Every structure is written in C-alpha cells, then in structure tokens.
C-alpha cells in the first residue's frame, strides 16, 4: 500500500469554500478506477494549512467513508506544534487509515535534535505506521539523512516522503536505514529517477489529473521496465513542472476542474485563483499529456 502512485489528493470545495462531498467522491472513484495505490488525505495539496483542526479530521474521515475500503487512505497529520500533531494523529488511531504522513514543523525551524524529538513523540502516541515528510521548499526546514537514520530505528516510523528533488538523498538515506524502510519521492519531476535509484513510489500531485498515467509509470518502473516508464514520464514532464507554475495546489485544482473531476477550483485565502498565464500553462501541459 506504500508503493506505486500515491495521490496527494486535493480537497474539493464548493463556491462558498465548504468541502464538497460530491466532488470528493468523484475524485476517489476516479483514483480507484485508474489504479492509484493509495490516497493521502489533507496533506499540503489537500490545503491542510487553511482547514481548521476539526475540518482536517472531518475530511480524512469523509475520505475513509467514501473510499469504503476500495483504496487505502493515509492521513496527513503534520503540524508545527508537536502537541497538535500528536492530537491529530491520535484522532485516527482506530479510524481505518493505514498510516500517517507527517511533515516537518514549518516556520519555527527546529534543530535536527528538535526534529528527532518531534517525530519520536508523535510515534510514541500511536501504533499507526508513520511516514516522515521532508519538503524544505515549503517548510524552511530540511531534515538531514542522519536524522532520518535515527528516526528509522523507531518501530512504527516506516518510511519517508523525500521532496527535496535532490536525488543524492536516496543513496544517503539508504546507507543509514534498513532495507525495508520505505523511500517515496515527493517530487513528480524527479520521481522516475528516484525509483530507478531504489525508491518504491511517488506521493504525487500530478496523479490528481493523470491517475492512470502515473500508476502505469510507477508500475513499469518498479518492474524494472525503465524505458517504457520513461516514455510515459516524458509525456507527463510538462505537467510535473507546470502544476507548480503557481503555488500548489492552485494549478492542480484548476486542472481537476478542467477535466471535470471537481465542480469548482475554489481555494481559501490566502490562496487565490489561478492567473491567465497559469491557466494557459496548465492547459498546454494537459494537452501534451493527451488529457485534453
């Protein structure tokens, strides 16, 4: 369940900014039908930063309900206060989620020892598998391989979503962890190469609009069929980059709307609607991928 194409799912909203259950079901059905391995609910792409604590939990529970056992659900449970991350994680202890994805604390920029103590404390309050999430471009905090190696010794810390885009991290981390520690790319543009170097999948933004293509690319890469996987990846490369032409999830939410997967591309402030330039860039990338 922690391999292949795992979608970092958008959180669809209606025109008033409320979570849209109808569109959420449509998205989940789309991923079930197109081979996505698992769903991450309420991660960065799911707008965790602009959902209240209560809404955050409610969206994960709604996702579980609508998935109805058809696809594994991973809960995003990150926060920059350790107590809040623990509280979020504990809410899902007996919920049915298969694990938690927990981002490094953002803005307050802890030391490496602070990161170790943060994730250790969370793991001590749950039996759920914990996937670390390192994305310094969003958090201002880079969890170094040595810290990952220390955390990997904790029983229920089972893997990491590495989103630096720095492929040398694969080798650096692999040298410090056991063979069964899960390495997932969090950067679509380098995900293919990440798997060729020993990663086992991608937690993907692109999969929101190209579920089948990402699932096929990951399946082929993990089977060692890299030429075939790379052919798909080349078709998707403009999407991998243009979905970040404006801050995530602005472009991908608009892409979901353009494909009819959600009713609106509504976001909550301070995220604002996609610009004309962004719309043109995403449209061109969707066409290049054969999706429009």
Curated annotation (Swiss-Prot):
Residue(s) at site: Part of a proton relay during catalysis: 44, 107
Subcellular location as annotated: Cytoplasm
Catalytic activity: L-aspartate 4-semialdehyde + pyruvate = (2S,4S)-4-hydroxy-2,3,4,5-tetrahydrodipicolinate + H2O + H(+)
Pfam families documented for this protein: DHDPS (PF00701)
Keywords attached to this entry: Amino-acid biosynthesis, Cytoplasm, Diaminopimelate biosynthesis, Lyase, Lysine biosynthesis, Schiff base
Active site per UniProt: 133, 161
Top-level taxon of origin: Bacteria
Signal peptide segment: none
The name this protein goes by in its record: 4-hydroxy-tetrahydrodipicolinate synthase
Lineage: Bacteria, Pseudomonadati, Pseudomonadota, Gammaproteobacteria, Enterobacterales
């Amino acid at each position: 369940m922690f391999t292949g194409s795992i979608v970092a799912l958008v959180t669809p909203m209606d025109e008033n900014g409320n979570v849209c259950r109808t569109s959420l079901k449509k998205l989940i059905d789309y991923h079930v039908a197109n081979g996505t391995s698992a769903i991450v609910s309420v991660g960065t792409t799911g707008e965790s930063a602009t959902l209240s604590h209560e809404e955050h939990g409610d969206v994960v529970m709604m996702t579980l309900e609508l998935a109805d056992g058809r696809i594994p659900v991973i809960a995003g449970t990150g926060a920059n206060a350790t107590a809040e991350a623990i509280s979020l994680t504990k809410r899902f202890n007996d919920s049915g989620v298969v694990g938690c994805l927990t981002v490094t604390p953002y803005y307050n920029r802890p030391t490496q020892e602070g990161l170790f103590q943060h994730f250790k404390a969370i793991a001590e309050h749950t039996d759920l598998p914990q996937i670390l999430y390192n994305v310094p471009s969003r958090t201002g905090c880079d969890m170094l391989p040595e810290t990952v190696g220390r955390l990997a010794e904790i029983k229920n810390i089972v893997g990491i979503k590495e989103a630096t885009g720095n492929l040398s991290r694969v080798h650096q981390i692999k040298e410090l962890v056991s063979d069964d520690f899960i390495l997932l790319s969090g950067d679509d543009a380098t995900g293919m190469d990440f798997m060729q170097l020993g990663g086992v999948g991608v937690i993907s933004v692109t999969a929101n609009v190209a579920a089948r293509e990402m699932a096929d690319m990951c399946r082929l890469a993990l089977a060692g069929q890299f030429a075939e996987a790379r052919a798909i990846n080349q078709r998707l490369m403009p999407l991998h980059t243009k979905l970040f032409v404006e801050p995530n999830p602005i472009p991908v939410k608009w892409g979901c709307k353009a494909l009819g997967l959600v009713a609106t591309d509504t976001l909550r402030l301070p995220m604002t609607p996609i610009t004309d330039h962004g719309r043109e860039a995403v449209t061109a990338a969707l066409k290049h991928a054969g999706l429009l």
